[in-house]
Amino acid sequence: MEQFYYVLKYLILGLFQGLTEPIPISSSGHLVLAQHLLGLKIEGFSFELLVNSASLLAVLLIYRNDLIRLTKNGLSYIFTRAEDAKSDFFFIIYLVIATIPAGVIGVLFKDYIDQYLKGVKMVGISLLITAVGLWIIRNLRGRKNDGDLSMKDAIIVGLAQACALIPGISRSGATIVAAMLLGMKQETALRFSFLLYIPVSLGGLLLSITDIANDPNLDTLFVPYVVAFIATFIMTYISLKWFMNIMAKGNLKYFSFYCIIVGVLTLIFL
């Protein structure tokens, strides 16, 4: 019975992570709230890495054609300087540049963030900040395509992603808001945001391999972890496909409304 409870608990959290990871409402913030409301305590550091890896796998699957094209054209430009591959080569460079701020800040301030910025009230405040950003860009229609991006764009979007280390600040929301304020088209902002998710997640996973291997709960929670991984992967895939349709229709304001409601309720009642 206890094993069933653990499986059910991790199934719920896996579905929750998968649903909230792609959409701009902060998956990390919602996991904090879910654990608080349900009285759940996650045993071990591996769980967060596990579900992030599942979400990463779903993103890789959805953007596999973009990744293949970028890799092919990036290598082509390096060796042949083919003009038609230039924009993809620099798109890769800008992704690398945009990855740096979150990587550096995450390494330097991880302990501080874990200790002081993961409280429920902080999540409520951060959700309200996310709501404001989404409201500001609700009617924006930029003109920049992949080939129009600059180093300045990459740095600013990278700094926005670093802000999302705070639970309640949505990573996808922060990067899409920054990208659209810089004049990117919605589809360009969305693609840059989720392709940027890949190196950040891979980096975090590689840096934490030893934590996973040494997790004392890995043996006892193996089945619940597997269930959570599968649930997160499936739900992330569905949620990201849905969010891509929402972005195409320009309905980001509804996520703003949601973040306001949850943020206010969190500050009042939790």
Swiss-Prot record:
Primary localisation category = membrane
Single GO MF annotation: undecaprenyl-diphosphatase activity
At the top level, the lineage of the source is Bacteria
Q: Which reaction does it catalyse?
A: di-trans,octa-cis-undecaprenyl diphosphate + H2O = di-trans,octa-cis-undecaprenyl phosphate + phosphate + H(+)
On whether Manganese is a keyword of this UniProt record, the answer is no
Q: What is its EC number?
A: 3.6.1.27
- What InterPro entries does the record point to? UppP
Q: What does this protein do?
A: Catalyzes the dephosphorylation of undecaprenyl diphosphate (UPP). Confers resistance to bacitracin.
**Protein name (database record):** Undecaprenyl-diphosphatase 1
